[in-house]
Amino acid sequence: MNKSDSINEITTIIKGIFLAFENHNPDEIEMYMHPDATVWDVFTPHLIRGKHERDKFHADDQEQMQARGPLKLNIEEPEVDIWSDFAIAKYYLHYEYQSPNPTKGSVRITDIFYQVNKAWTIVHHHEGSVPEGVPKIES
């Protein structure tokens, strides 16, 4: 697989994961995750480790998602760097939940991929809120 094909595959995986999220299908998300993968979620204060913790996280995440209201997602084109069988994808995700419990924001995401048997799998997914600048300093 050449570099361009790998970048296209990784980009397709990322878009597929968020489409699965919108469609309430965590099993499809898990198809792309290494069994030992870790997750820093933007709304979760602790590191999520491995498949067992991710299953609980998915259940809780789907519950809060469905309680909020309809969701709109916009993913910016990922920037992907590849080194042999490792890759890092960096991108922005913009989300907006509608009523009855609206909220919106932007998240910067880094995914670390590892190639196993010629297929890319996520070994770490990291989300962080996009800062709005340096906080004001009171004098």
Predicted stretch roles:
Residues 1-35, 134-139:
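Short, low-complexity N-terminal intrinsically disordered segments enriched in polar/charged residues
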Residues 75-80, 93-95, 108-114:
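Hydrophobic/aromatic beta-strand elements that line small-molecule binding cavities or substrate pockets
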Residues 106-135:
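Short beta-strand edge/turn micro-motifs at domain boundaries
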Residues 95-104:
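Short, cysteine-centered beta-strand-loop-beta hairpins and adjacent loop/turn segments enriched
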Residues 33, 93-95, 126-129:
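Short beta-strand segments enriched in hydrophobic/aromatic residues
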Residues 72, 85, 89, 104-105:
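Residue-level preference for beta-strand/loop junctions
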Residues 19-21, 39, 50, 109, ...:
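Anionic, Ser/Thr-rich low-complexity intrinsically disordered regions
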Residues 26-82:
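A solvent-exposed, acidic/Ser-Thr-rich amphipathic alpha-helical stretch
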